[in-house]
């Protein structure tokens, strides 16, 4: 199924905007890592793989103690991978918790430094001093998932998350090919109708392209073997 909700500029990204079903798999970036939303996905029988920041959620051990994230990260070698069975605290006291699995990957030093530079630039633009933990966490990929290890190993979870970039590319393609970023109408209702029309066109194009790719790349059907005649080669002069 395809679900679309079109909001105004004041509407925040949230997994609560959609109705999830058993068998669904949610892929989301840091903006979707909200504790109650993730629990709602799991309660619906769906699963999630989302990226998180070091302080986005209150992570706990299964005993309810604070999970020492940076101690776990310190044990990883470059490009090393690890996972931990944890829980997400749903209230301040941490008495209500939801089980989850944390997958951690240490980046190469080159990639880590690029991420740290990005974090510093963002802090400068906001007129702030970058947090030391933010710089440290920039050297890692942190994924939270409801998938257990029997269904998806840590490497599989990381591979699933990389599929998210294909989704990003779809929206970039929409903005480029359909001029989706330009709104010719100022009225909210007209603008909404215009965007919906563009999205319908995009879905139709996607179906047409899919059918074309499934078709053989020849204009004429290949005749049966019985209809083919094999003429002997002409002798060389």
Residue ranges: model-predicted function:
Residues 1-237:
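Single, function-defining residue in the core of a domain
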């Amino acid at each position: 199924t395809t679900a679309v909700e079109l909001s105004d500029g004041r509407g925040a990204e949230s997994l609560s905007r959609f109705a999830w079903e058993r068998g669904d798999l949610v892929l989301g970036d840091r903006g979707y890592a909200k504790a109650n939303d993730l629990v709602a996905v799991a309660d619906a029988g769906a699963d999630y793989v989302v990226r998180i920041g070091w302080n986005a959620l209150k992570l706990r051990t299964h005993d309810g103690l604070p999970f020492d994230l940076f101690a776990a990260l310190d044990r990883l070698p470059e490009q090393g991978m690890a996972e931990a069975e944890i829980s997400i605290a749903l209230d301040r006291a941490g008495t209500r918790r939801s089980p989850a699995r944390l997958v951690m990957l240490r980046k190469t030093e080159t990639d880590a430094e690029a991420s740290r530079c990005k974090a510093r630039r963002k802090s400068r633009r906001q007129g702030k001093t970058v947090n030391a933990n933010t710089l440290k966490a920039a050297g890692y990929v942190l994924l939270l998932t409801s998938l257990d290890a029997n269904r998806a190993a840590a490497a599989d979870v990381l591979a699933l998350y990389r599929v998210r970039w294909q989704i990003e590319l779809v929206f970039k393609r929409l903005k480029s090919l359909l001029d989706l970023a330009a709104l010719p109408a100022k009225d909210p209702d007209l603008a909404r109708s215009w965007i919906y029309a563009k999205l319908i066109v995009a879905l139709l194009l996607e179906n047409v392209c899919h059918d074309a790719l499934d078709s053989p790349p020849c204009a004429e059907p290949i005749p049966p073997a019985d209809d083919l005649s094999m003429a002997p080669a002409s002798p060389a002069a």
